[in-house]
Amino acid sequence: MPVLHNRISNDALKAKMLAESEPRTTISFYKYFHIADPKATRDALYQLFTALDVFGRVYLAHEGINAQISVPASNVETFRAQLYAFDPALEGLRLNIALDDDGKSFWVLRMKVRDRIVADGIDDPHFDASNVGEYLQAAEVNAMLDDPDALFIDMRNHYEYEVGHFENALEIPADTFREQLPKAVEMMQAHKDKKIVMYCTGGIRCEKASAWMKHNGFNKVWHIEGGIIEYARKAREQGLPVRFIGKNFVFDERMGERISDEIIAHCHQCGAPCDSHTNCKNDGCHLLFIQCPVCAEKYKGCCSEICCEESALPPEEQRRRRAGRENGNKIFNKSRGRLNTTLGIPDPTE
């Protein structure tokens, strides 16, 4: 029976990926469709992806598939053809190609079965996730941005919004998608006469959010097809103004794609203009925060003097100090301080 999970250490896999000479292409895609047996589907896809040397993060559930992956450039078209042939529901599926890609986004393949491909917290049996808002293409997005009756709602987390967003887009203050959904409904109650335009990184969150808004009585709901990634790509291809400002946060080693030259965020340590996220180098912290090059040198990649001092201790002493601490890494939130998460790079679908 073939091995259906990775058995090589992360360090070895990362070193192997960094030594590769062939360029890689970072791709994201999702599809809401019924999967009768997610476990069997997962195992079959794992073999397909492994044969094509695909790395990345893939989630499957009865409601569909959500993937962020890295594919050797020479295998991209073969991957596309085999994915389309895998299930009729996937034929012609839109693949979002990364905008700002060094090919070093992933170095291991992780494929998991979950209850949902997006953790939404919705338990309403009458909710119809297929009753989504209308798609908007790049030119239509720009027209909506100039429409005084349209409100753009950013369905990403606060640390994503902080480094980049559409002009005048509303932030729904939250640390997870499941927190955002009820807040979006609450915040928009007085604006049911407005045109609601929802967006996210690649489309998966705003598509479900648009259905949730319609379920809660909002009738004028749109969402951007393919999210920020596809919007920026199509706008550039069509010679349209790109109205997204700043950087598009992404959930892989790159931590961001440059969309415009503007830097709208600031270093969390000194306040200098900066939009580069990093994780604190102290293994007992791993705070996700924004750090400028000057502070990175001053604090040796750490978020504070305390972490800087601790990271310089002998490994055994560091382990002793970490013993008994709350597990999980953290996210910097300017209004709420440090927040727990379970990954160094947070998962947008949690």
From Swiss-Prot:
Coiled coil: none annotated. The keyword tRNA processing applies. One of its GO terms (biological process) is tRNA modification. The keyword Kinase does not apply. InterPro entries: Rhodanese-like_dom (IPR001763), Rhodanese-like_dom_sf (IPR036873), Rhodanese_C (IPR022111), TrhO (IPR020936), TRHO_N (IPR040503). It comes from the Bacteria. PROSITE patterns: RHODANESE_3. It catalyses: uridine(34) in tRNA + AH2 + O2 = 5-hydroxyuridine(34) in tRNA + A + H2O. Keywords: Oxidoreductase, tRNA processing. Residues 146-240 form the Rhodanese domain. It is an enzyme of class 1 (oxidoreductase). The active site is at C200 (cysteine persulfide intermediate). GO terms for molecular function: oxidoreductase activity, acting on paired donors, with incorporation or reduction of molecular oxygen. PANTHER family: TRNA URIDINE(34) HYDROXYLASE, UPF0176 PROTEIN YCEA. Catalyzes oxygen-dependent 5-hydroxyuridine (ho5U) modification at position 34 in tRNAs, the first step in 5-carboxymethoxyuridine (cmo5U) biosynthesis. May be part of an alternate pathway, which is able to bypass cmo5U biogenesis in a subset of tRNAs under aerobic conditions. This is tRNA uridine(34) hydroxylase. It comes from Escherichia coli O17:K52:H18 (strain UMN026 / ExPEC).
